[in-house]
Amino acid sequence: DQASISQNDINYINAHGTSTPLNDKFETMAMKSVFGNQAYKIPINSTKSMIGHLLGASGAIEAAVTALSIKNSMIHPTANLESPDPECDLDYTSGHSKELDINYAMSNSFGFGGHNTSLIFKKYE
């Protein structure tokens, strides 16, 4: 609401993606709840799969990666994603980078104790 865009405008998500069974399952459920059927059409990746969990610094690094993904029209793969949990059935990018013209992107950061944030980025015009 505060971003003045529709959830249908988001066309890339940098997930919190800790590669833990509960987190990935619940993050997938949350994306389905927010985006409905559109969730299945949004490319998603996890930066943590490549750099690990940097705790308090994770959100800043992932925000920078999201901004660079918009600038370069490219998203990195989720490293080591070979057989996702059946409940994690969205468009998780794996294997190789994907070219993508990104207009709006979302970067999720979820912390211990319920400190949760989703940042929305827009392509500079």
What are these regions (language model features)?
Residues D1-E125:
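Conserved "HGTGT" condensation-loop signature of ketosynthase/thiolase-family condensing enzymes
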